[in-house]
């Protein structure tokens, strides 16, 4: 299963590379040379093109719809998705060759910025969504991890397999596990982390930080390997500083 998943990921990355060669000149055509520009909630953001992975998406047709390259672009257009990679911890443009090679376990940060259309100023609603009761999911008791400064709960979802998975079969599994971490400040949740489980190796391997930047009307997602979780405060802070530094005044 894991080998198949890795094969699928490699195929998807190859497909994205081909699309990138076709789309990139059109996507960046209406931006200042070497930069990608657009708006989030009226705030103009311009970032060096070297940070962009694949392509930025603008309001209009989705990137899988014919004619989407004709969407309005540039500083007067609204972003719908701004995907980037950055090295860690210096937040320089990420090495794309490493990104394509390492995939989900990329050694830097993968950042995606999207418009935020809710009135919330924090991410409490997403924590509550992750912890909602479902018939096929069970939750361990919530604990507080002092050395991280985060609450944690593990959620397990049973996967129906046919034929049933044999207990000692190392290559099949019937559970999907997520680890949810979050911080709390005065009862509100400024950031939540969704960490993915690698069943054959029985370990968490990648986390997604989700937080709101109300000052620019954006939802921010940052993906990183589990080893960086103890640095979560720096990851959130430096990502915020990076994004704010690219707002055009």
Where does each model-flagged region fall?
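N-terminal secretory signal peptides that target proteins for export/translocation
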Residues: 1-11
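Sec-dependent N-terminal signal peptides
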Residues: 10-18
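Charge-rich, low-complexity N-terminal segments
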Residues: 30-157
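Short acidic-hydrophobic surface loop/beta-edge motif
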Residues: 33-40, 181-183, 209-211
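Signature of long, low-cysteine stretches enriched in small and polar/charged residues
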Residues: 149-203
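Long, compositionally biased interface segments
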Residues: 196-249
């Amino acid at each position: 299963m894991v080998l198949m998943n890795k094969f699928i990921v490699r195929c998807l990355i190859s497909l994205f590379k081909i699309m990138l060669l076709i789309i990139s000149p059109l996507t960046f055509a209406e931006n200042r040379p070497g930069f990608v520009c657009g708006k989030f909630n009226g705030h103009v953001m311009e970032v060096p093109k070297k940070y962009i992975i694949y392509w930025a998406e603008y309001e209009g047709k989705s990137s899988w719809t014919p004619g989407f390259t004709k969407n309005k672009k540039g500083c007067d257009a609204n972003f719908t998705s701004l995907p980037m990679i950055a090295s860690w911890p210096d937040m320089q443009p990420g090495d794309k060759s490493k990104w394509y090679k390492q995939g989900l376990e990329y050694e830097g940060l993968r950042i995606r910025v999207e418009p935020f259309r809710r009135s919330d100023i924090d991410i409490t609603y997403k924590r509550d969504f992750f912890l909602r009761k479902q018939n096929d999911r069970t939750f361990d008791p919530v604990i507080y991890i002092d050395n991280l400064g985060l609450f944690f709960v593990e959620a397990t979802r049973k996967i129906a397999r046919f034929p049933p998975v044999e207990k000692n079969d190392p290559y099949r599994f019937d559970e999907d596990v997520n680890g949810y971490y979050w911080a709390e400040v005065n009862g509100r949740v400024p950031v939540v982390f969704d960490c993915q489980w690698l069943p054959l190796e029985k370990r968490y391997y990648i986390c997604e930080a989700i937080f709101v930047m109300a000052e620019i009307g954006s939802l921010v997602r940052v993906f990183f390997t589990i080893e960086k979780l103890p640095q979560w405060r720096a990851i959130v802070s430096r990502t915020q500083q990076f994004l704010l530094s690219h707002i055009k005044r």
